[in-house]
Amino acid sequence: QTGLSVAYDMPTLMGYDPDHPLSEGEVGKCGVSVFSIREMEKLFNGIPLDKITVSQTINGPAIILLAFYIATAENQGVDPSKLKGTLQNDILKEFTAQKEWIFPPKPSMRIITDMLTYCSKSMPYYNTISISGYHIREAGSTAAQELAFTLADGFSYIEHGINSGLKVDDFAPRLS
């Protein structure tokens, strides 16, 4: 099976359009610029999304990029339930380490929980969150702190999923 890993540029990671003043000099610099469904369709033009897995390194605007990805698949005639892949979507580590967040913690966790709910019901082969400790360590933590924060983040995602009414066995296997 073939897989692709998509790294987005800084404006996309921060939720900015490429013509925003803060995007100047950053568009396409360290990844691809995707700011619309049209751009997502260009990115995957000629690539059958039902035949590959796609890993997307995106956090703050993950729900928007997921919507673009689903729309692109549907425009290819692919049912979202057939999609395989992973979103990084680890917003909690953004607050403690990487600092690429858009919304405050509470609304961010609401979005994450909504994505867990949608994907667990509609995209059974899709990993909704890839919990990452790497950035925490790179931000200066010890190995023990990296492990502690990473596990705490994972437990928090599970707790939010359960509190929203999901059964742990319906969504936790799709966390990586």
Residue ranges and their predicted role:
Residues 1-176:
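Catalytic alpha/beta active-site cores
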